[in-house]
């Protein structure tokens, strides 16, 4: 990856940043995609008020163990590529921090790693994910409240379910693998875990949900949001969009007295 020119948040093109882990000329580079997707997610009201986060593993790059992570406490719609943290799996070695950038870029803010980092790492190590998305979607929060006495969210017989992967444990390797796509008659089950005062304290509950629900590609956090992962960033994006559609529909069905599953499930 080549040295690149990146924009300061305040003044465009004021600094050239010599950084081998960034590449301004590649629109599909993880650092650039994170910024693009964060703006898209902001427009969908999924990452407002600095909430939420996203990380991408460079699965198609020279080192597929590199993970790019958006920082904490930053307005996601204004995020710039040079603001990324980079860690290397499996040891989670920190290779890059935006705090090492020139003072003209960092003098007004001390960057912190995303509080979602240990949860993102859980998705990479337990599911070999290529990207992990965390949003504060109101649809996710509402479903967690409407299913307040449940530890699972369920919905079936909805066409949009077909956008989600059908997952199964490979008996030989013990790993969860995609074996196809869910079908109209399939029942989607998402685990719901309880929120905690601090994001990182969700890690154990998330890991337990990932372990106990090999068929899921997402976990709902009650009164908080959702974590979604996929084999690459584009799959994770599709899964997140499909799930948000289903969660919004489920809220409307619940409020209208329509069951989200059928008696034949």
Swiss-Prot record:
Cofactor requirement: Zn(2+)
Function: Catalyzes the dehydration of methylthioribulose-1-phosphate (MTRu-1-P) into 2,3-diketo-5-methylthiopentyl-1-phosphate (DK-MTP-1-P).
Lyase listed as a keyword: yes
Protein name: Methylthioribulose-1-phosphate dehydratase
Binding-site positions, Zn(2+): 134, 136, 224
Pathway: Amino-acid biosynthesis; L-methionine biosynthesis via salvage pathway; L-methionine from S-methyl-5-thio-alpha-D-ribose 1-phosphate: step 2/6
Assigned protein family: Belongs to the aldolase class II family. MtnB subfamily.
Localization per Swiss-Prot or TrEMBL: Cytoplasm
Cofactor binding mode and count: Binds 1 zinc ion per subunit.
Reaction(s) this enzyme catalyzes, per UniProt: 5-(methylsulfanyl)-D-ribulose 1-phosphate = 5-methylsulfanyl-2,3-dioxopentyl phosphate + H2O
A GO CC term assigned to this protein in UniProt: cytoplasm
Keywords: Amino-acid biosynthesis, Cytoplasm, Lyase, Metal-binding, Methionine biosynthesis, Zinc
